[in-house]
Regions:
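Short hydrophobic/aromatic beta-strand micro-patches
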Residues: 8, 55-57
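An amphipathic, aromatic/His-enriched active-site/gating alpha helix that lines ligand/cofactor pockets
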Residues: 35, 57-89
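Short S/T/G/P-rich N-terminal loop/turn motif that feeds into the first structured element of a domain
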Residues: 1-35, 39-50, 62, 85, ...
Length: 99
């Protein structure tokens, strides 16, 4: 399954900021994602808004939870199941709610 991870943090907890910098944060996050076995499809960053977005693929809830642990340590994490838009359109057509 695909999941969208939306992780936010405050200015005060920003690992790339000046108040509580963590120069190893991206390495920790990369290690955590790889160790968990979760496949990172893509990642995005809204630096001024202090928000990360990741699209990941996994069928293992425990692995998903382990993958995002570094993000939880600096802020809040929301995980939602998603599907590719093209797959959603095909599904909607198949069940008759779209032409």
């Amino acid at each position: 399954m695909l999941f969208m991870i939306i992780a936010t943090h405050t200015v005060e907890n920003c690992p790339g900021g000046t108040i509580r910098p963590d120069k190893e944060f991206t390495a920790k996050l990369d290690k955590s994602m790889k160790k968990s076995g979760v496949k990172v499809m893509e990642g995005y960053l809204d630096a001024p808004g202090h928000v990360w977005y990741f699209v990941v693929e996994t069928d293992d809830n425990k692995a998903l939870s382990n993958a995002v642990e570094p993000l939880r340590l600096v802020g809040e994490v929301k995980i939602v199941p998603v599907m590719r838009f093209s797959e959603g359109v095909a599904w909607a057509k198949k069940i008759g709610i779209q032409k």
